[in-house]
Amino acid sequence: MDPMITGLGVVALMGAAATIAGAAEDLESDVGSQSNPNSQVQLAPQMGHLHRIINKAVSGEPVAYGTWCGIAGSVAFVLMNSMQLPVIMAIAIGAVIAAMVHTTYAVTSHMGRIVSQSQFNQPLFMDMLVQHLGPIAGHGFIVTFCTVGLSYLMTLPIPGFAHPFPLPLLAVLWGITIGAIGSSTGDVHYGAEREYQQYPFGGGIPVAIHGDITTKAELGARNSMDVVHFCAKYGGPLTGFAFGAIVFLSFWNTIVFGITGGIISGLIIVLLLIILNNRLEVFARNRYGPYKEEE
C-alpha cells in the first residue's frame, strides 16, 4: 500500500480520536466545575447562594489532564512492553486506573472545598457527589483512552510518524494540550451562558458579579447534570472539533508535502486562520455592535 495513503489513514484516525477526546474533556470539566468557571462556583456561598454543583477542580485542566493521561500512558507502556498485552487492552487498563485516580482526587477536592465554605452555611450533599462520580469517571476514561491511543499512533513505524518520544511522555504532552483546548474553548461557553443565565448574554462576566450564579433549574435546584446536558449541545462538540482540527492539521500536511512543504503549508494555514478570525470578529462587531447597558 502507498505509504502516503497509510499515513493519511492514521492521521484520520488520530483526528477522530482527538475529536471524541476533546468533546469528552470539555463535558467532564463542565460536570465537575473544573478550570475557569470553578472560581465562580466556590464564590457562590459567599454571595449567599447555596448550591448543589460539583466543585472538584484539583488544578487547571492542562495540569490535570497531563497527569491523568500520563498515568494512563505509563501503565499502558509497561503492560505492552513487560506483559506483551494487546495495545487496546493495555490502553484500556491504563485509562481505567487513571479514571480511578481521577475520581479519588475529585472526591477529596470537592469535599475539601465544600467543607471550607461551611462558615457560609454551605452543606455537603452526599447524594449529589455520588451521582456525579459516574459522569466524571466516564468522561475522564474516554479522554485518556483516546489521548493515549493517538499518542500510540504517533509511535508507529510509518513514514511521517515513528516519534522518538516514548508513549508516556507523548501522553503527558497531549494531555496538557487537550486541557488547554478545553479550558480556552469550552469553558467560555459554560461560564458565560449557564452559570450566569440570569444576566443578558454577551455582556461578559464582570468581577462585580463573580459568584452570583444561577442556582435554580427549570425544575428544582440546579446541579452539574443540568450544566453538562446543556453544554453537550454546543460547548462539548465545539471543543472536540477544535482539538480534532488541531491534531489533523498538524500531521496531514507533513504526510502530503513532506517536512519542508509541510512547514510552508502550515504557515499558510495559520495565516488563513488569522485572517478568517479577524474578518469574523469585524463582521460581528459591525453587525451587532457593542454591548449596551439597559437604560
From Swiss-Prot:
The keyword Lipid metabolism does not apply. It is found in: Cell membrane. The complex is composed of 8 subunits; MtrA, MtrB, MtrC, MtrD, MtrE, MtrF, MtrG and MtrH. Belongs to the MtrE family. Pfam families: MtrE. GO terms for cellular component: cytoplasm; methyltransferase complex; plasma membrane; vesicle membrane. Pathway: One-carbon metabolism; methanogenesis from CO(2); methyl-coenzyme M from 5,10-methylene-5,6,7,8-tetrahydromethanopterin: step 2/2. GO terms for molecular function: tetrahydromethanopterin S-methyltransferase activity. The keyword 4Fe-4S does not apply. HAMAP family: MtrE (MF_01098). Keywords: Cell membrane, Membrane, Methanogenesis, Methyltransferase, One-carbon metabolism, Transferase, Translocase, Transmembrane, Transmembrane helix. This is Tetrahydromethanopterin S-methyltransferase subunit E. Its EC number is 7.2.1.4.
